[in-house]
Amino acid sequence: MLEKLDTLGAYLLAVLMAGTFLYFVIAHQLGFKYAKKLFGTRRIKEQSQVIPLEGNLFAACYVRTNQPRIFDLHIHHELSAAFLYRWYSEGKLKLVQQKPAFETVNYLSIQKDAVIRDQEENSLYQKFCEASGKDGLLEVDEVYHWSYSHPGDLYGFSPEDKGQEWLEDHGMMEPVNPKDKLTNLGARIRPLTPAGAAKARVLVELQNFLQAQAEGKPSGPLDTDWIDDLLCYGQLFGIADKLAEKWRTSLTEEQTIVVGLCRDLALAFFNGNNEATD
């Protein structure tokens, strides 16, 4: 009798293992994967090419840095890189190449009379205008030296506070609760409303899609019609360089150069300030 039960148990175990394997094979073919980055383990569509949070980069920054169980990253320089690439895609920045000797030097020329309606975004834009000097050219070393000579709060405001304000204005945050967890700075981590969480979830879906693209994993076809938007968020996630390498056949040489230049300028912008205030 015990021998029969052992045989039956082994048979059921084999069936269970085979069924589980078959399920994951079918799920993979249907374009699903599992993500643990947000709200626990959840099955999501592999390809998510939807602009999250209406394209508001400050809100995305807040979600990434303040919401529990999402991301725990200090991404201010990545936020600046994302804005730089967005301004380039909007025509406010243009690539300038000069050959003073044997090596081409890349700059970004900045349109100093550009109109940016958002006050905080414009504040950041104006600082890059100042860093560009009289010739209006953003060059890595010059941006670093400008930043070093202007120590202090480079933003002039908190990107996270700006993001929280946007989420509040759009009814996506729960009211203040004394029981909410505290950040390292003592601020309350306010949870998103269910509707807000659903919209914020698109951010991690996009991040998962871009991460899979950067790693060369199956993630569905790439919609090249909005590849500049994808590269903007790639900057925010710190993987734009990897994306540019993987998408090199879909990008112009200029786009590839600008991706790296935006990253380098953003790093120079913050490294100079950090070293001046250390």
Model-identified regions with their sequence ranges:
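Acidic, Ser/Thr/Pro-rich intrinsically disordered cytosolic tails and loops
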Residues: 1-278
